[in-house]
Amino acid sequence: MARIETTTRIAAPRERCFDLARSVDVHVRSAAGSAERAVGGRTAGLLGPHQEATWEATHFLLRLRLTSRITVFERPSRFRDSIVRGPFARLDHDHVFEDDGAGGTLMRDHFDYAAPLGLLGRLAERLFLTRHLRRFLDARNAELKRIAESDEWRRYLRDGVAPTDLA
């Protein structure tokens, strides 16, 4: 099993960062490099407790499908999405949000995963998979930071609710 940890400082309130991080629409936008899209479960708006989303994305020239569920939800401090079905033997992604003491947020990711195929999977983790997933998380976090620190966040949130959830 492998673990990736990241910390991103965002000059925006914790509640905004929390909600943007659980937005299906922001996720799709921030994962454009892998042509990721939501194809099942919650496909727009904000993911909440026990909700699932099924994602399709291209990684290593393979079109992959993964379904995750929100298994921990403590707004605005943290949430966890865990794999239900997909190409990993195990995957838990904890998103943690802390006030930075200056009106902003420290967003921390704890990404625990295990590749399938036993020894071959562990070898893949060490040789290339962890590096690939870290780059994916870093790119996603940079886009989330950019959105949160600009007025663009208003396209995705209104009073802690996604505009698509208001219809």
Regions found by a protein language model. Give the residues of each.
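Hydrophobic ligand-binding cavity/cleft-lining segments
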Residues: M1-G48, A162-A167
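Short, surface-exposed coil-to-beta transition loops
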Residues: R3-E5, R63-T67, R90-H93
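Generic structural detector for well-ordered beta-strands
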Residues: T7-A11, E56, R69, V96-E98, ...
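Beta-strand elements of well-folded, non-transmembrane domains
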Residues: I10-A12, H59-L61, V72, P87, ...
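Residues within alpha-helical segments
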Residues: F18, R22, S82, H110, ...
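Glycine-rich portal/gate segments that line the openings of hydrophobic small-molecule binding cavities
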Residues: V28, A38-R85, L106, A139-R155, ...
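Beta-strand/loop substructures that line and gate deep hydrophobic ligand-binding cavities in soluble
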Residues: R80-L137
